[in-house]
Regions:
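N-terminal auxiliary segments of SAM/dcSAM-dependent transferases
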Residues: 1-47
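Class I S-adenosyl-L-methionine
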Residues: 222-280
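Conserved beta-strand signature within the Rossmann-like core of class I S-adenosyl-L-methionine
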Residues: 208-217
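Class I SAM-dependent methyltransferase Rossmann-like catalytic core
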Residues: 47-88
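Conserved SAM-binding loop of SAM-dependent methyltransferases across substrates and taxa
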Residues: 103-120
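A short glycine-rich, Lys/Arg-flanked "PGG" loop and its adjoining helix->strand segment in the class I
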Residues: 193-208
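S-adenosyl-L-methionine
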Residues: 134-173
Length: 280
């Protein structure tokens, strides 16, 4: 099973749990939610509106279909283009902490790189941290379904970054070799004052030599916030850039064609900013 076939299985499961009177009614719910998400992402800096709630299964399906496919490809590209990240993921064992990684972009992007690079005999443990517990159901079967020459262990852990009681007890993830932040800071920018202690905790406690891969919308609010956190915690810049990120969708169209016919094309291009940082 390749990666897009895996996403197809995840989408099939997510589609099946949506309650509606008919398939056409279910599809209409999803189409409306895709439009709603697009509108919500245009208002990520509007503090009068709370952070997006992903407890609704329709919203989770809409996100995975519309955004996860593209965002995973961006992660793959950024890893492929940075030697230190490539070497890290070729080690016999690597631990990754995917912060706000419930939608799966971080995990799938790493897997896509490993598969395309032909990596063998390695073991990757991905700690996926997110407030919405239901995301864990989406990725719990990855190790069983993915036929790969390397081993992958997704470990979902629920936390609310604004509530220290939910994350102070977690210690193991702080020894991760790589921390990923894929379109996460923009989701929580509205509550940045409450989120700052969590990010400071992670960046101050991460081990020497570990790295952070940050990618998000190319907006000064989000990028400046990350840069402030990185500077405050003495992280070294390995690479940074603002650029358009895009992906080739031939594989996606073949394996996800049923959903393309129903819901149109997933996101294919983004005006993005990324940072690759290292703990000195």
């Amino acid at each position: 099973m390749n990666l897009m076939q895996l996403i197809k299985v995840v989408l099939d499961d997510a589609y099946g749990v949506i309650t509606a009177e008919s398939e056409s009614a279910r599809d209409e719910l999803i189409k409306a939610e895709i439009d709603s998400l697009s509108s919500a992402y245009a208002k990520l800096t509007d503090r009068k509106i709370g952070p997006i709630d992903y407890s609704d299964p329709v919203k989770r399906f809409a996100y995975i279909f519309k955004y996860t496919v593209a965002h995973a490809d961006y992660i793959m590209q950024l890893i492929r283009n940075e030697e230190e990240l490539r070497k890290m993921l070729c080690r016999p064992a690597t631990e990754v902490a995917c912060l706000g990684g419930g939608p799966g972009s971080d995990l799938l992007g790493i897997l896509k790189y490993l598969m395309q690079a032909g990596v063998k005999d390695s073991c990757v443990t991905c700690y996926i941290f997110d407030k919405e517990r239901a995301w864990g159901d989406s990725w719990s079967d990855v190790a069983r379904l993915l036929n790969s020459p390397f081993r992958v262990y997704p470990v979902f852990q629920q936390m609310d970054i604004t509530d220290p009681a939910t994350w102070k007890s977690y210690q193991k993830f702080l020894r991760a070799d790589l921390f990923t932040l894929s379109y996460f800071l923009s989701e929580v920018w509205k509550i940045k004052e409450s989120a700052d202690p969590f990010f400071d905790h992670c960046m101050s406690q991460m081990k020497r030599g570990s790295m952070i891969l940050f990618v998000d919308n190319n907006s000064s609010q989000f990028v400046d916030w990350f840069d402030e956190l990185a500077t405050r915690n003495s992280l070294k810049t390995v690479k940074k850039e603002s650029c358009n990120l895009a992906f080739s969708n031939s594989e996606e169209k073949k394996d996800l064609g049923l959903y393309f016919d129903k819901f149109g094309w997933p996101k294919r291009e983004s005006n993005a900013a990324y940072r690759i940082m290292k703990k000195a």
